[in-house]
Amino acid sequence: MNLIFTPPSLEDLIRLLKAWRFWVFGALVGAALGAAVYFIFPPEYRAKATVNVDFNFEQAFPENTDRQDFYYLERESRKMVELAWSDDVLAQLNAPVEELRGGKLNLSQPAEAGWHFYADDKDPQQAEVLASAWANAFAEKAQAEIEAGNLNEFIKLEVTQSANLPKERSIPLANYLLAGASGFLLLAVFVLLFIKPK
């Protein structure tokens, strides 16, 4: 078979399965290429700071219902996400706001409990500084909003991780290995199925 839109025959599929040595070799070559790209053009470092957020449902709604809990959690979480990305908070990070909002910072929050503040940078120390500053600025701003009555008074925040932060590459090596191996094998399938041997 050498036409792209022609369905493969049983013989073509058998030929693919018989070439197991080629698949193993192709996977190794693809993974090696992925590793080479990773080390030649490494992704940025990522640091993670954590702020523990407790909405205290029991105190906010002594006779609560699930619907009240959900609405309260969704409303207050949305307000706090807006705070995290606000100009006042980002201005304290000593970096261009456009750059920070353009992918250098990422927020992962499960509504209640640990809110994770991620910062990416080529310099691992700078990534740590950004993540730590962002988490602390958020906690201070949120506390000020609680005291001003703009957030529920029962919300409690605590910066639990802002020093000696874990730093790792923003994209793990395993992703590069998998992408390299998969890409090489897909190319190999195309070659074996659609290029007729002489």
Regions found by a protein language model. Name each.
Residues 1-198:
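Hydrophobic and amphipathic membrane-targeting/association helices
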